[in-house]
Amino acid sequence: MIVSDTDFLSSFAKIDELKLVFRVFKTKEIVITESVHNELKEAPVFDLLLTYFSAKENKIIIKKVSAKDVPENLGTGERESITLAKDKRARLLMDDRDAGKYAEKVDVKVIDIPSFLFYCKEKKILNTSQLKTIISKLKSKDFYEFKSAVEKALVSDNWIPSYI
């Protein structure tokens, strides 16, 4: 199971790359919580997501969850997403640094946008040109900011995974 928080899903919807997320994780469903759904409803990108709620494949499913034992200083969407991912032992797509650090402390596998893109690069799902395009779209349409070293590594043809 793949659980997503608002930021990750919204970012890839804005650049019309949600299909890539489904493809990379070899899943037909991404699960979000009611709070994430409510946050997305307020976002300009919501209209782009509507088809995913009623699709037969590449579908976004909404689950009702009560956040439990998660710090109150995190947003409701983050809290519920962490709870759901922990309860279901699912991977969590989340780009909020503080929430991600907490989630990892409670043994939730968190995948942020740079990690996702590095995985796509390592597995040769995306080539350098495609990565440059996605990075450019994230920066221009989502105002996403990459650390300079991360961006250089993503678009470098000589990048070697750090665990080698």
Functional labels for PLM-detected ranges:
Residues 91-94, 112:
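Short hydrophobic alpha-helical runs that function as membrane-insertion/retention elements
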Residues 9, 37, 99-100, 117:
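A generic structural signal for short hydrophobic patches within well-formed alpha-helices
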Residues 3-4, 12-65:
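PIN/NYN-family metal-dependent endoribonuclease catalytic core
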Residues 7-8, 27-29, 86-91:
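Short active-site oxyanion
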Residues 44, 100-164:
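Acidic, PIN/NYN-like endoribonuclease modules and their adjacent C-terminal/linker elements
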Residues 76-91, 98-99, 119, 137:
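Acidic, metal-associated active-site segment
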Residues 56-73, 97, 149-150:
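Acidic catalytic patch
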